[in-house]
Amino acid sequence: MSLSISVVLFDVDGTIVDSAPAVMSAFRGALSDYDLPIPDGQRLRTYVGPPLWYSFGDLGYEGELLANLVNGYRARYHAHFLDPKPFPGVIDLLHELHDAGVPLATATSKQAPMALAQMSHLGLSTVFDVIAGATPDPASCKATVIHEALTRLADRGADVSRPVIVGDSIWDVRGAKEAGIPVI
């Protein structure tokens, strides 16, 4: 019997690690830097996962202020991005898939260098065949990261004809739909 899935992509924030506290803290800090109102915890939690440009834009910010908020968030988050812990069982699952020969990749809205550093910090850099993440470009979206991950896996010889992404948010679902792959 062969696997019906040829490669598995994983979102990082909210799927591999519980990054909500660090994300929300950086978000609050960026808004506080400009004395801007801070959304309540429930609304703030909806900004864990989406691209930063969307999240701050959703609050009505644009132009130079939007860019400053994104940069302020990144500076604050960079100081704590290694703090989030993996969800229970995730590390074992990733090792089991890797040991079974399933090609694995990240496909995260987190910037690629941070994703690599975080996977290295968790001891997972050798479990993933590809660590793909967003670029600083506001046009970088989940679907482009998914396509990059699949292209890089294919370049390494993986069969990418039956991919799936594992994620936790509507952004993962939308990105998968746009990229034309199933999502769990």
Give names to the regions the model predicted.
Residues 2-46:
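Active-site neighborhood of HAD-like aspartate-dependent phosphohydrolases
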Residues 2-3, 99-102, 152-160:
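Glycine-rich phosphate-binding loop signature in dinucleotide/nucleotide-binding domains
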Residues 57-95:
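Metal-dependent phosphoesterase signature
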Residues 30, 50-64, 118, 149-153:
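Helix-loop "lid/cap" segments that line or gate small-molecule binding pockets
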Residues 83, 113-164, 170-179:
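Substrate-recognition "cap/lid" segment bordering the active-site pocket of phosphatases
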Residues 23, 48, 86, 142:
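Conserved donor sugar-nucleotide recognition element shared by glycan-biosynthetic enzymes
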Residues 27, 90-119, 132-134:
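Substrate-recognition element of Asp-dependent hydrolases with the DxDx(T/V) motif
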